[in-house]
């Protein structure tokens, strides 16, 4: 990838691990960004994927796309970042980025000065907590405010 292009990091863990919902949103977002923008390079970040993927070959490939995978599962990464609050920046896995986007409710730690973009799709975990597992409600109630 040319060094002069801005590098946009995107957490694509949901795109790899979820067939619908936020996973589909993230896959469509990446496709649309690549189709409509030729000025940026994209560093797609994922936690270690499961053995079986719900969607075969979920991510695009190309000269402006670089996939970086952490050696830990999403469960372990989120425990480190949001339960233990270890400030291990996502750039440890992605390398240098100019912007980081998390499309799935929470941001990982980033290096000081790295701009971030967060998508919070809804607040149903606040308004309808009975429709979620208690563990997920507890996690989101803790992690989302820290990310916003």
Mark where each language-model region is.
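Carbohydrate transferase catalytic cores enriched for Leloir-type hexosyltransferases
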Residues: 1-148
């Amino acid at each position: 990838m040319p060094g002069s292009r801005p590098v946009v990091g995107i957490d694509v863990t949901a795109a790899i691990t979820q067939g619908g919902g936020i996973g589909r949103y993230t896959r469509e977002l990446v496709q649309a960004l690549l189709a409509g923008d030729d000025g940026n390079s994209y560093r797609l970040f994922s936690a270690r994927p499961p053995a079986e993927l719900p969607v075969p070959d979920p991510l695009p490939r190309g000269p402006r796309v670089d996939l970086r995978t952490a050696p830990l599962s999403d469960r372990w990464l989120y425990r480190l970042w949001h339960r233990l609050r270890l400030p291990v920046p996502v750039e440890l896995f992605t390398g240098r980025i100019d912007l980081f986007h998390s499309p799935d409710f929470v941001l990982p730690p980033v290096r000081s000065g790295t701009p971030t973009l967060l998508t919070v799709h809804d607040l149903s975990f606040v308004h309808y907590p009975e429709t979620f597992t208690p563990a997920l409600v507890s996690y989101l109630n803790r992690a989302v405010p820290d990310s916003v």
